[in-house]
């Protein structure tokens, strides 16, 4: 009899332990705006990954290109200059050194489309979540979303004071500083300020000029004003500015071609047959610099059976770059300088 009581007691303890474990590990409901309306992740009929702010911090995601560390099937590729880079989802995407080539992975920040690649490379502001939609999304997001969408949602200004400063250092004299502050202005208005700097020395050497290349030198500022009225009206005004000024980019050969033999015949140095080389032989330092700015007004009005949303924005981008397009120490081709507004 005592034996059966002992077994019954153990069974009850085991059942209660399972219930307590289940209650303490409830799955948090994930909200996404992948279909332009707020729905739970289970209700969205598309393939989407949602990355929270905590996941971004833990993975040390600095900019949109780092998202490939936490999102399956998302890839990024760097081309000849800082701004000539591209996103690929499930292997699909457009990448080129041609400024006229439109991307097939659309990137939105708070509902505002970033059309130029150079406006996508700056560090992320204070983020609430990032949504990555896989597959064609042109019905809701336009013609440049045939491969997918990266949708970045930033934190709204808070009516409670909050400030945060974070710094990180790394090899090649890498220094990253991020600052964020938010506070109320009145019972119906709040603001936030966000500033980022990202600097690092180059990890490759130009043997002709003696200077480093592939360095990092970027700055960004963002100001946000939130107005909430008693009649379910929300107005959010955002202004942002960022700039970059870098020597980029290092190149390497996978195998020797006839053009390389021509460079050797002219007494020039060319990139070795090593895609991971830390040396380049440009007869001048290839550089890439630019700045981006924008302002947007987001109006949301809650009605009885619907929500009215209006997003109005204006963006401006300027860039200047010069590339040694023969990739060797000779002057076979003149410097290719591009100024894009």
Which role does the model predict for each range below?
Residues 26-160:
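Acidic, small-polar-rich N-terminal luminal/periplasmic segments of exported/outer-membrane proteins
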Residues 85, 102-104, 116, 126-128, ...:
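Outer-membrane beta-barrel translocator/receptor signature
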Residues 1-24:
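Cleavable N-terminal targeting peptides that direct proteins into the secretory/outer-membrane pathway or into
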Residues 36, 52, 80, 91-93, ...:
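A mature extracytoplasmic/lumenal domain signature
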Residues 105, 163, 331-335:
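Short, basic, glycine/proline-bearing loop/turn elements
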Residues 42-44, 143, 204, 248-250, ...:
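Short, solvent-exposed loop/turn and secondary-structure capping segments
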Residues 210, 216-341:
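Outer-membrane beta-barrel domain signature, strongest for Gram-negative TonB-dependent receptors
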Residues 33-38, 169-172, 225, 241:
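Short polar catalytic/cofactor-binding loops
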